[in-house]
């Protein structure tokens, strides 16, 4: 019996839930096998982590027993101690899932010279769980030990290293230089640097004074066309005896700023809430979006974290959907704020991830559903 497919959102997805990324999947897998360095720019909730870690990474690892995937989530790191914690989490998880306890104790332990290795049983899964205890007390020195362990592993295994939300190390003094030394010492290792805060990534990789200037090959994830979304939607709506018109889907995709996670969240809402045997029109989508937004009580609490001026800028960006020049006279007249104040707010909103910048379109609210909510807030 075939399992009914739903729309997955706010979770990491596998290939069965991926919509039209086959070309990118093949290209990135080829880059991984060749030991390339890739800097992947993509807005938040575009599925870059799922694509690189869950799909390309697993494809890479299945290619050979000597292939080994290491994933490090660097989102919101603000100190050397937090970087150390993420390195510990990534390395121990990879070791626990890839190697047997016997293999770790017989061989892998030799690559972990800066640590005391302990293997416990995970109480939730019953699976072996590796724990590394640092022999030094200073976070920076421990980071060097993690880097050294990874370099030693790279001599025995073909590694694919994923550094997710890498741009946040920019908030930690000295971290960029630390990573530059580490990355340059890895010879044939595939490195995938993922990031969504383009303004930070631009400084890190395009500023001639930055430690990582011109590192890696720049890559992007582009919007998925309605042409490819349509069969994806119809397949998941069909078991609920629903069908969506192309014009309605075009409207939905546009209002969700082409963000796959938001598109799928609305898709699942439609699947669960629209009466059976309904042909979903633009009018139905508009009504269902309003109903969905009314359930989003968390948005009101989220906005309490912003000043009135910051909320004004957010609301005006959501009104225009995309703003190319927030320093333009037209936008400044709309928000009724000085240019310097507006520029400061834009920078802050970018830093905290409240807004995104897309090269061809401009600034937009990061969460499309929040943007929709702001229209009536």
Identify the function of each model-found stretch.
Residues 37, 131-198, 206:
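Conserved Walker B catalytic segment
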Residues 1-43, 58-62, 114, 155-157, ...:
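A short, basic N-terminal segment
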Residues 41-46, 50-159, 189:
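P-loop NTPase nucleotide-binding core
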């Amino acid at each position: 019996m075939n399992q009914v497919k739903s729309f997955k959102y706010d979770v990491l997805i596998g290939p069965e839930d991926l919509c039209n990324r086959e070309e990118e999947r093949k290209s990135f897998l080829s880059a991984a096998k060749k030991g390339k360095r890739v800097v992947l720019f993509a807005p938040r909730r575009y599925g870059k982590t799922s694509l690189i870690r869950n799909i390309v990474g697993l494809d890479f690892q299945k290619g050979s027993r000597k292939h080994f995937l290491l994933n490090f989530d660097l989102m919101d790191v603000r100190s050397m101690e937090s970087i150390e914690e993420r390195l510990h989490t990534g390395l121990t998880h990879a070791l626990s899932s890839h190697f047997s306890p016997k293999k770790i104790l017989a061989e892998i332990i030799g690559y972990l010279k800066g640590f005391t290795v302990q293997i416990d049983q995970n109480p939730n899964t019953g699976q072996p769980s590796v724990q590394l205890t640092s022999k030094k007390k200073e976070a920076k020195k421990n980071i060097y030990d993690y880097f050294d362990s990874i370099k030693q592993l790279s001599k025995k295994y073909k590694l694919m290293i994923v550094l997710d939300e890498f741009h946040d190390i920019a908030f930690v003094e000295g971290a960029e230089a630390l990573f530059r030394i580490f990355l340059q010492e890895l010879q044939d290792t595939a490195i995938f640097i993922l990031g969504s805060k383009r303004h930070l990534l631009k400084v890190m990789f395009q500023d001639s004074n930055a430690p990582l200037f011109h590192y890696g090959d720049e890559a992007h994830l582009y919007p998925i066309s309605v042409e490819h979304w349509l069969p994806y939607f119809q397949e998941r709506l069909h078991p609920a005896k629903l069908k969506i018109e192309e014009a309605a889907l075009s409207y939905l995709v546009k209002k969700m700023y082409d963000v796959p996670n938001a598109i799928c969240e609305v898709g699942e809402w439609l699947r669960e809430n629209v009466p059976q045997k309904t042909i979903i029109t633009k009018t139905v989508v508009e009504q269902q979006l309003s109903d969905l937004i009314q359930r989003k009580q968390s948005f009101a609490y989220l906005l309490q974290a912003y000043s009135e001026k910051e909320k004004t800028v957010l609301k005006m960006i959501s009104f225009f959907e995309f703003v190319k020049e927030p320093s333009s006279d037209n936008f400044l007249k709309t928000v009724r704020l000085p240019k310097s104040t507006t520029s400061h707010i834009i920078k802050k909103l970018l830093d905290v991830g409240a807004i995104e910048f897309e090269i061809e379109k401009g600034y937009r609210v990061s969460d499309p559903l929040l943007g929709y909510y702001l229209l009536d807030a």
